[in-house]
């Protein structure tokens, strides 16, 4: 199953962390009151998702080869101007944990005084685990009951990715 993810360009561990400057930023919501309940945040959308859910509301974020629309340096400059005005930063996607620069970006957001939130599907429990000490809140996107993952996320019904995806999401909940 990990070969499926490797073919999609995913590194399964954070052994080779990258700089936040390597992030492919697909969008920035400057002020959100809905992405983290009870908090005023900025939401950063990261490009790339291993799944193609039938009801995806961000289909433009699926292809990890799509270039970003802004550099992390621009995001960081924006966040510096919002210090004391926002409660936090939420990283979302796509699936943000697939980007190796996420760890550094979260550290930088904390260094600026922001709380850090994460929206994830839990598809990469081995990538999520080392991020947990940096995360103040998680919005966990369970796609379906485990038996129905294949019908929601798999592009090829013969693929085992639905079973693997369900198992990984449930493992991430632990």
Report residues per predicted region.
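Short, small-residue-biased leader/transition segments that mark boundaries at the very start
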Residues: 1-5
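Extreme N-terminal tail/first-helix region
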Residues: 9-23, 67
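Canonical Radical SAM [4Fe-4S] cluster-binding loop centered on the CxxxCxxC motif
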Residues: 34, 38-71
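Short, charged low-complexity linear segments at domain edges
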Residues: 17-40
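Short glycine-centered, acidic/aromatic-flanked micro-motifs in structured strand/loop junctions
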Residues: 93
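Conserved alpha-helical substructure of the radical SAM core
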Residues: 59-89
